[in-house]
A protein has these predicted regions:
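Extracytoplasmic/secreted proteins, especially bacterial periplasmic and envelope-associated proteins
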Residues: 32, 36-40, 60-71, 101, ...
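Catalytic Zn2+-binding segment of zinc metalloproteases
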Residues: 40-57, 71-77
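Short pre-active-site segment immediately N-terminal to the catalytic Zn-binding motif
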Residues: 19-35, 52-57
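Active-site metal-coordination segments of metallo-dependent hydrolases
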Residues: 51-68, 91-96
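Phosphate-binding glycine-rich loops and adjacent basic patches that engage nucleotide phosphates
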Residues: 1-6, 26-36, 68
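C-terminal capping/extension segments of zinc metalloprotease domains
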Residues: 1-14, 19-25, 74-153
Length: 153
């Protein structure tokens, strides 16, 4: 979990985790833990990035961090199966998408990053956010279908 005490500051951020939650999600290897920390670190990097969507884009930021987790896994040839399987059964809420959507974005990031490299697109944070958003728009009807369980729009 990423805690930001002051939205405008990078100097007061805290990165922490819940061991029981990690155990419940089957995060039982250094590689899986590293991917979870990639997701949490992504929240820090994106803390001042505005995403479109209900609840100030809370789901979209979660999915973007999941995508970045997948990107890292693709670049370093890391296994995402434990993290993805641990997330698949997690319920959604107003702040977090259901696990099936999250696993989808992790897997997409892992395999899509190779295409991005082959196209010669520099792997900058902004370019990867753009690539994430292209995919988000492709499957927006599926995302909104899930969001309707938690939001009225």
């Amino acid at each position: 979990m990423f805690v930001n005490w002051d939205r405008g500051s990078y100097y007061d951020d805290v990165l922490c985790f819940n061991m029981q939650q990690l155990i419940d999600m089957k995060v039982d290897s250094k590689e899986a833990f590293s991917l979870v920390m990639t997701h949490e670190t992504c929240h820090r990097v994106l803390q001042n990035t505005q995403f479109y969507g209900p609840n100030n884009g809370a789901w979209e930021q979660e999915l973007c961090c999941d995508y970045f987790m997948g990107v890292r896994a693709g670049l370093w040839n890391m296994d995402v199966s434990k993290v993805a399987m641990g997330l698949i059964t997690t319920p959604g809420s107003q702040t977090h998408p259901e696990g099936t959507l999250r696993a989808l974005f992790i897997r997409y990031g892992k395999y899509h990053v190779k295409e991005v490299q082959q196209q010669g697109i520099p792997l900058t944070i902004q370019n990867l956010i753009t690539e994430f958003d292209k995919y988000r728009l492709q499957i927006l009807p599926d995302i909104q279908k899930e969001q309707r369980k938690y939001f009225r729009f």
